[in-house]
Amino acid sequence: MNSKILFLGAVMMLPTFASCQQEKPFPDDAVDKVYEYLPEWQAGYLDIHQISTGRGNAAYLIFPDGTTMLLDAGDLGVHTGTQEIMNAVPNDSKRPAEWIVQYIKHFSLPLKNNGAIDYALLTHFDTDHIGQNGKLAIEKVGLDYKLTGITHVGNLLDISTLIDRGYPTYDYPTAAKVTGAHISNYKLYVTGKVKRMKGL
């Protein structure tokens, strides 16, 4: 009786071992095309680009009608904790915003808009989404704010409409949750942008 149970148990385990030993499928042709450039955007297509700088989140979208959107533009800066997570991509010869702008200008060529962004949407106010305000944030004469993340992108490219979750009071979900030097820097950028739009 015990030998029958043992045999039955061994037979039942065979499919498990067989599935673990499956041959890998034939190589996909797409694998050989990894280093080819993505095709240019065409009217009627939706292009979604995740831009990896190794320093924060950024995504660039071109909608079927040619409308463009940037989702976040983070800049964690360069410090030990950041480098333990991921190296700067493609390298640290430029700031994250400069890599983002270079990427956008390349893929927006069919639009003939010099990389202009119709909408920039910030999902939330963490540094990996809007930029940090540490020693690596760039100070520029004549600006009330430092260049980092979205403020740096906005200084290099035209952003028509900026969408965030707090304007104008920045108290969502509570004012205490929307604090920090990086947020103060971002608010200065927004204030300056609003003044310029109003011609003040």
State each model region's role.
Residues 22-47, 53-54, 103-106, 112-119, ...:
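Flexible, acidic/histidine-containing loops and adjacent segments that form or flank the divalent-metal
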Residues 5-14:
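Sec-dependent N-terminal signal peptides
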Residues 39-119:
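Conserved beta-strand hairpin/beta-sheet module of binuclear metal-dependent hydrolase folds
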Residues 1-2:
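N-terminal secretory signal peptides that target proteins for export/translocation
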Residues 16-19:
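C-terminal motif of bacterial Sec signal peptides marking the signal peptidase cleavage site
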Residues 124-129:
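Histidine-centered divalent metal-coordination motifs
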